[in-house]
Amino acid sequence: MSSSQTLVVKLGTSVLTGGSRRLDQSHIVELVRQCAKQHEKGHRIIIVTSGAIAAGREYLNYPDLPATIASKQLLAAVGQSALIQVWKQLFAIYGIHIGQMLLTRADIEDRERFLNARDTLHALLDNKIIPVINENDAVATAEIKVGDNDNLSALAAILGGADKLLLLTDIEGLYTADPRSNPDAKLIPEVFDINDELRQMAGDSVSGLGTGGMATKLQAATVAGRAGIDVVIAAGVKPDVISKVIDNEPVGTLFHGLKSPLETRKRWIFGAPVAGVIIVDNGAEKAIKEQGSSLLPKGIKEIKGDFSRGCVIRIQSLQGKDLAHGVAHYNSDALRLIAGHHSQEISQILGYEYGSVAVHRDDMIVS
């Protein structure tokens, strides 16, 4: 068995409906079987599901509604609960729990909400619960919509620290031309660089129910790839497609992620304005420099400046030496209260807890 992987599986409307106007229950059963099989092997599966509007239409027996945003949001509100019930009932067959997360762009772009969403996602995964993510279409406006579930799945992959992102659709992958209209179209098995030529090859969605086409899948592959995540575009009807991706078998089109995503992250953390300084004791200094450890509240001696959770801060020694840059897991007021205390005391002192660390080692670049 391959070592444990985190895989985001994005299921488009065309995959969930089979191109029809209703959910294809038999195909969803098969996709759940594949996900459950990998979950039982120890892999961490995150599902990004489309289909809420299609499910709402079916549930309400195809009402004749005007093509307005309000009508779509009505269908999404009704359909989302119906859709999540389908996932819940099917995974329950395998004794697997799911957890629903509804996101908007604001949850991603606001750093504090980003951290909250990330913590929730990791908590679900750590407790062997499969997250089922969708955009919150019932309330999202154009200003706060991610816009399509392809890009949402890329953001979910980054939130979840995924190894791979699988975009399941109604064609085999990226072709040199539209295979539905051009018999000479050839499948492109591997992509190392997404350039303008590739973008010109991308066609448009034809299902009518979805919001994403090949162009949005290339956008998603670009976003995830910059974070070092491999992306596969493949046909949802391909037998055992999820297992094949986990096992690195050739299927669809593989977009290779950057091999050194840490460099991108390092540039972001070092490039971000420093909002404050955390002074640490000698023990914390040694743990950070020699062991690459997270910074615990116990090792904090002083907080300089006022900053929010999610801001980039500088970590310094008692002698004023720069030790690291990192992302604060608590705001400055909270850190002042818990400084010098054991992590077990955080919830007692603050009345809430965002975890046991002040700055996580994954969010820290040692100087």
UniProtKB/Swiss-Prot annotation:
Its EC number is 2.7.2.11. ATP binds at K10, T169, D170, T211, G212, G213, M214, A215, T216, K217. GO terms for biological process: L-proline biosynthetic process. The keyword Kinase applies. GO terms for cellular component: cytosol. It is found in: Cytoplasm. NCBIfam families: proB. Belongs to the glutamate 5-kinase family. PANTHER family: GLUTAMATE 5-KINASE, ISOPENTENYL PHOSPHATE KINASE. This is Glutamate 5-kinase. It comes from Proteus mirabilis (strain HI4320).
